[in-house]
Amino acid sequence: MDKIKIALQYMMPKHLISRLVGKLAAAELGSITTAAIKWFIKQYKIDMSEAAQSEPEAYTTFNNFFTRALKPGIRPLFDDKDYIVHPVDGAISQCGPIKGDQIFQAKGHEYSSLALLGNQADDAKRFEDGDFATIYLAPKDYHRIHMPIKGTLSKMTYVPGDLFSVNPLTAENVPGLFARNERVVALFETEIGPMAMVLVGATIVASIETVWAGTVTPPAGKKVFTWDYPTEGPDVITLDKGDEMGRFKLGSTVVMLFAKDALDEFAKDVVPKAVTRMGQPFAKIED
């Protein structure tokens, strides 16, 4: 059965399906939208008591519901300068050292940081022998992405690609999954060195947004687009620890990369399959 599911993903028109779902998710359809939201809440057992707007009728589009804000204080920030925090609600897919430029995906599967970062060689070199973490956001999760540490944006890269599902089954069976799906790479300069936040698209993920650029929608095609940002002066973009940096419309995966010797150790509960909550301790940083 698993092989059939994977084979179907190779065959299905993933981009077309994602575009159609995206249009529906952005449409204001009144009672139809409300009914869809209620079904989704029941199907995925979503705890709406955490949402700033808990009533399904409060959302005019499915996208508004999916990117819903949480009540203030519902995700307290672990306020210890020696720790960086989880950027999202989700589950750890994998985490650990980057071996040279190789990142562990699942048993029998690795991929390179060079491929993940859109073949930006200078960027990839900064993360050789560093550390990584891959966090999967399930449909039930809160889908805004926050900063694990204060950082100044230096570069954004849009990498076109496929739109495979990014659930655990696909991660175990599709080689180089996170380096072949469509993605947005945000490179930050931090007190512990460079940090990459890679927002990976997936089937029916209508779009990826950042707080500085809005929805990232370059022209269709195979071209990689890059944007450089000043790290000094009046136009600098600096986000504090815990600030929102982006969001998914219909969920996916975040891959974080850190430079060699930036992290001392992961928090004790940061292990594969562990549930994450935004703002909780993720890793201790080097002194």
UniProtKB/Swiss-Prot annotation:
Is synthesized initially as an inactive proenzyme. Formation of the active enzyme involves a self-maturation process in which the active site pyruvoyl group is generated from an internal serine residue via an autocatalytic post-translational modification. Two non-identical subunits are generated from the proenzyme in this reaction, and the pyruvate is formed at the N-terminus of the alpha chain, which is derived from the carboxyl end of the proenzyme. The active site is at 89 (charge relay system), 146 (charge relay system), 252 (charge relay system), 252 (schiff-base intermediate with substrate). The keyword Electron transport does not apply. Keywords: Cell membrane, Decarboxylase, Lipid biosynthesis, Lipid metabolism, Lyase, Membrane, Phospholipid biosynthesis, Phospholipid metabolism, Pyruvate, Zymogen. Its EC number is 4.1.1.65. It catalyses: a 1,2-diacyl-sn-glycero-3-phospho-L-serine + H(+) = a 1,2-diacyl-sn-glycero-3-phosphoethanolamine + CO2. Pfam families: PS_Dcarbxylase (PF02666). GO terms for cellular component: plasma membrane. GO terms for molecular function: phosphatidylserine decarboxylase activity. The modification Pyruvic acid (Ser) is found at residue 252. The record marks 251-252 as: Cleavage (non-hydrolytic). It is a peripheral membrane protein. Binds 1 pyruvoyl group covalently per subunit. One of its GO terms (biological process) is phosphatidylethanolamine biosynthetic process. Its cofactor is pyruvate. The keyword Transport does not apply. InterPro entries: PS_Dcarbxylase, PSD-B, PSD_type1_pro. Pathway: Phospholipid metabolism; phosphatidylethanolamine biosynthesis; phosphatidylethanolamine from CDP-diacylglycerol: step 2/2. It comes from the Bacteria. It is found in: Cell membrane. PANTHER family: PHOSPHATIDYLSERINE DECARBOXYLASE (PTHR10067), PHOSPHATIDYLSERINE DECARBOXYLASE PROENZYME, MITOCHONDRIAL (PTHR10067:SF6). Heterodimer of a large membrane-associated beta subunit and a small pyruvoyl-containing alpha subunit. Catalyzes the formation of phosphatidylethanolamine (PtdEtn) from phosphatidylserine (PtdSer). Belongs to the phosphatidylserine decarboxylase family. PSD-B subfamily. Prokaryotic type I sub-subfamily. This is Phosphatidylserine decarboxylase proenzyme. The lineage of its organism: Bacteria, Pseudomonadati, Pseudomonadota, Gammaproteobacteria, Alteromonadales.
